[in-house]
């Protein structure tokens, strides 16, 4: 009870304290006359509308076909084995239609009848089981090999589009899933 009484009295004492009012003079204001008006020409709005950048169409089939031919002749590649074609990664600063590139790779391999290709539905189910989102382009070779092991694939085809001084290249690597050994590697200019 004494504490409450002490707090109330302290509050009343502090509330009754008043600081003396400061007697400061306001800052002097000096009027400034405007200078001569300069004539300005109004800026006319431009009627020119900029064109959006054109999407460059890339002939993925023409780029991929020679690489698949090379891969089919590579030493150590056995026909009839199961292949996981990983989606193409875009390591450029521009936009690319990597889905079309991946489809071109799958079509070229299917036409050669070299491998049994893991279906998209199996890949989708495996990604869900492993907790990988469908937007995850795997990005790392280790993730690609892990997914291939889960799917019991024998090979993984890892593909990356990279850019160096304006020159874009498609690099492909065929890897053995058991060891991670790169059996074949090839690249081709895109531009």
Curated annotation (Swiss-Prot):
Lipidation (S-diacylglycerol cysteine): 17
Subunit annotation: Interacts with PBP1b.
Pfam annotation, one family: LpoB
Function: Regulator of peptidoglycan synthesis that is essential for the function of penicillin-binding protein 1B (PBP1b).
UniProt-listed PANTHER family: PENICILLIN-BINDING PROTEIN ACTIVATOR LPOB (PTHR40593:SF1)
Chief place where the protein resides: membrane
Gene3D superfamilies noted in UniProt: ABC-type transport auxiliary lipoprotein component
Gene: lpoB
Protein's name in the database: Penicillin-binding protein activator LpoB
Keywords: Cell outer membrane, Cell shape, Lipoprotein, Membrane, Palmitate, Peptidoglycan synthesis, Signal
UniProt superkingdom: Bacteria
Membrane topology category: Lipid-anchor
Lipidation (N-palmitoyl cysteine): 17
A cellular component annotation (GO) from this entry: periplasmic side of cell outer membrane
Organism, scientific name: Xenorhabdus nematophila (strain ATCC 19061 / DSM 3370 / CCUG 14189 / LMG 1036 / NCIMB 9965 / AN6)
A molecular function (GO) term: enzyme regulator activity
Segments of this protein annotated with the region Disordered: 25-48
Assigned protein family: Belongs to the LpoB family.
Localisation: Cell outer membrane
GO biological process: peptidoglycan biosynthetic process; regulation of cell shape
N-terminal signal peptide: 1-16
